[in-house]
């Protein structure tokens, strides 16, 4: 049960926004007893917004880091291609599994740099969801990608041996759709090598940590799952990705 409100914020202006529930909604919440109410603010991509003050009738408790999954990936994980933030696979995943996700995706810059990996490893997280390869394939070969992924998995499994790591094989999903629809991909040969490296390293570290590789071929298969650029998922694609990840996480009790 959730309510959605939209507010327009002018650039360079300080705005005061009031969020208020209808009387019927308040009565419903009171009927639930002491169950907590979660307020989630979704900001537009590529926009900087600062909170100066939050005034509430009741005390607001911030979620602890260890209650959240950390999501790291490309613009796909940031929600590009979805109609709005609430339609992105990250948000759908939260709703499907009733979990909190801290989105650390970097549009065009998910390159697994050691400094970024070190930062992610320092976060006190419940688990990690990783969507890797889309950005890296454009600026490095599979050997360098494997080197960086090896460092990442080694660090996470060493520092967080009991922390689940879910890897979304998004390149496999894209290549599967291209193949079924006779689309020539400029990264076809490179994708095969990257996918092979991901599978190899998952197998290597699966004996040490709790790593779950989600097959891209089971996420989305039809062309309407992609947007017009044939790279970012469409709204339907985001829904399918969230559904595929949800099934795996439910199967292994990761939520």
Feature locations, PLM:
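N-terminal secretory targeting modules
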Residues: 1-69, 246-255
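Serine-esterase "nucleophile elbow" of acetyl-processing enzymes
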Residues: 39-107, 114-124
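The substrate-binding groove and active-site-proximal loops of carbohydrate-active enzymes
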Residues: 133-145, 182-191, 228-232, 236
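Substrate-gating cap/lid alpha-helix
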Residues: 173-215, 240
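Histidine-centered active-site loop/cap adjacent to the catalytic His
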Residues: 228-255
